[in-house]
């Protein structure tokens, strides 16, 4: 069920991740769920604990689902995560811990990257208790389906697990590789040096309805660096709220954009079908050089970097 693409993670890969890299899975699994929810058009009010926040009391996360999806019911969802080898035990412990204060309008959702053989039986028993409006459980096979519906998250977790998605790369990974290609490494603030107005305009456009945004620069990497700087700053150094993804072929572009979603797509190939991506909920950012005609009305001309601010960017690292 991986669309014939071995460069993308499957249910078996998620299971193997939890088994062989347990600490890594424990650290990054909440971030994966957050990215999946961000790319789910029906989801809002998303709050997922990641990093140091996972040790705090309370649910691991929550979200509001406006209408049912293939995997999630509508309503206020309360999430618990478990990456350890016995999902039945962990789910039961989490459920018992929460049911005394459960509300009849809440949905309890337990999510694991492992395969869970008796998942449906466990759900049926808990559902019959009536503590929650509904009880759901998602395992590795469910997550594989969800990833197919959330291509940017699919690419991100595949990169994390050392796979190399064909003709696609997250802007996060591109920046990590590009910034380290020099010595010293390039600071992300370098690419907004003297470009406060351009950054403000871009953030304003991104805050509106999905659209085509054109960035004109003298060189492609400069425009991508500007994108990385603005989006990282907007999301407090985390790209997950916008899921910016670079696409390098029409084949991969068409596969990603035919289903509803959200986020930012950056086509680096000739004549992408931007209308399809936009109508399905995604912003499209095209990179133009000085000789390329624009196709939309929203164009940002990147001025040359301000020398003194560029020096300050290196000094502040």
Enumerate the predicted regions with their spans.
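Conserved P-loop NTPase "ATPase switch" module shared by AAA+ and STAND
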Residues: 211, 216-222, 231-291
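Hydrophobic positions on the alpha1 helix immediately C-terminal to the Walker A/P-loop
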Residues: 226-227
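Mixed-charge (Asp/Glu-Lys/Arg
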Residues: 1-220, 283-317
């Amino acid at each position: 069920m991986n669309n014939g693409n071995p460069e993308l993670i499957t249910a078996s890969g998620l299971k193997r991740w939890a088994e062989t890299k347990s600490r890594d899975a424990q650290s990054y699994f909440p971030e994966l769920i957050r990215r999946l929810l961000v790319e789910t058009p029906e989801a809002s009010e998303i709050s997922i604990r990641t990093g140091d926040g996972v040790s705090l009391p309370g649910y691991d996360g929550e979200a509001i689902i406006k209408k049912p999806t293939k995997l999630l019911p509508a309503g206020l969802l309360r999430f618990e995560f478990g990456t350890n080898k016995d999902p039945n035990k962990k789910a039961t412990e989490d459920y018992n811990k929460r049911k005394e204060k459960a509300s009849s309008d809440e949905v309890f959702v337990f999510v694991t990257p492992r395969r869970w053989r008796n998942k449906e039986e466990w759900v049926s028993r808990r559902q019959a208790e009536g503590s929650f409006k509904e009880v759901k459980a998602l395992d590795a096979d469910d997550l594989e389906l969800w990833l197919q519906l959330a291509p940017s998250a699919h690419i991100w977790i595949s990169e994390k697990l050392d796979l190399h998605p064909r003709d696609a790369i997250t802007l996060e990974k591109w920046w990590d590789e590009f910034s380290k290609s020099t010595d010293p490494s390039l600071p992300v603030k370098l690419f907004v040096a003297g470009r406060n107005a351009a950054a403000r305009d871009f953030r304003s456009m991104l805050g509106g309805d999905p659209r085509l945004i054109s960035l004109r620069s003298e060189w492609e990497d400069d425009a991508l660096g500007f994108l990385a700087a603005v989006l990282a700053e907007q999301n407090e150094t985390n790209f997950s709220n916008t899921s910016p993804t670079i696409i390098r072929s029409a084949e991969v572009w068409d596969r990603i954009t035919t289903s509803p979603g959200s986020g930012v797509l950056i086509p680096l190939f000739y004549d992408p079908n931007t209308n399809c991506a936009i109508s399905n909920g995604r912003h499209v950012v095209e990179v133009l050089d000085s000789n390329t005609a624009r196709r939309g009305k929203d164009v940002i001309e990147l001025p040359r970097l301000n020398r003194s601010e560029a020096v300050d960017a290196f000094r502040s690292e």
